[in-house]
């Protein structure tokens, strides 16, 4: 992971619904409406090309880290699949547990729920090499994984965070914290 942009938004109204225009855009693109926050992250993915993930911040224990899976770890994904994790799977984790498969799909435990009021937004750049072939081997696909396999612009993360923040505040209310933007060495542009 060479770039990881994030922001916490507190005080969102969990009962808020995405406006009809946004839900219609998702539907026309083959995506179903899930919740206002998740709909916004999916819309921003369609609009800018940057996959995002939203976590329910109350289920995060400490700082997030990116690491490879350890022997014996398991993860229940948002699609309900329970995985026994293999050492070549890159994960987003908090200080105690895996939260999701990096660039592919988030975990069920930390996903946005009907009563989520504090959201942790993530927009990262995942190297295609750590995503390619993993979904096929695991037996499922995701829109994020599809895009990361083919490459996403490493510079898009901060813009995606800002766009998603503006939409979430307009639709769900809340107070946005500062944006964090962790970087490593970016790949050379051709």
Tell what function each PLM region has:
Residues 1-190:
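RNA/tRNA-interacting regions in translation and RNA-turnover enzymes
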